[in-house]
């Protein structure tokens, strides 16, 4: 009788077990790396919004900062196709990219975070603003919350699980240390 060549069932089970052990070690590290990348992107987005706000304030002094209900949309282009044919206007300043200007809800998040802008001013000119970012899926896309106001200093809350509607006073509190 000829001896058959190949792997035995035990050998195959051992190989599968080794692969599962390696996956069990690697997958959590991969998820933590993704959360870290999303948080870095969120902090960068806050910085981009701050830069856009300064440019907006300089370009449209009668409006002040873009700090009303459509603040992020005002900083970006009106459509994904780009700026209006006549050039930027205060309702479509084209200072930030389309994806960031639309990242105002969980469904329209940018790199796992969505953003909001609040103001203490009731009407234009808006002389103050606070921008904040929250994870779209807490503990999956991010853990920390981020905020900043017109001073440009970015603050982070180590476990922020709420909508991005942080006020200037909360952003400056001890619960939100500077980055």
Regions inferred by a protein language model and the residue ranges of each:
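Extracellular/periplasmic head regions of type IV pilus-like filament subunits
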Residues: 51-144, 148-151, 158, 177-179
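Aliphatic-rich helix starts adjacent to a transmembrane/signal segment
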Residues: 29-46
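A short acidic/small-residue loop/turn micro-motif
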Residues: 160-164
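Short, low-complexity, Pro/Ser/Thr/Gly-rich segments in the mature regions of secreted, periplasmic
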Residues: 168-179
């Amino acid at each position: 009788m000829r001896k058959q060549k190949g792997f035995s069932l035990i050998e195959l089970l051992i190989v599968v077990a080794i692969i599962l052990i390696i996956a069990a070690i690697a997958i959590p590290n991969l998820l933590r790396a993704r959360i870290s990348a999303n948080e870095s992107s969120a902090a960068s987005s806050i910085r981009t919004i701050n830069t856009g706000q300064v440019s907006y304030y300089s370009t449209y002094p009668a409006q002040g900062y873009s700090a009303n209900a459509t603040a992020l949309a005002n900083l970006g282009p009106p459509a994904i196709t780009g700026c209006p044919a006549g050039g930027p206007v205060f309702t479509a300043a084209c200072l930030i990219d389309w994806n960031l200007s639309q990242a105002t809800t969980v469904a329209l998040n940018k790199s796992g975070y969505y953003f909001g802008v609040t103001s203490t001013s009731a009407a234009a000119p808006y002389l103050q603003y606070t921008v904040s970012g929250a994870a779209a899926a807490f503990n999956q896309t991010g853990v920390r919350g981020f905020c900043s106001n017109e001073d440009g200093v970015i603050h982070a809350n180590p476990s922020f699980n709420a909508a991005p509607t942080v006020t200037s006073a909360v952003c400056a509190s001890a619960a939100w240390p500077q980055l």
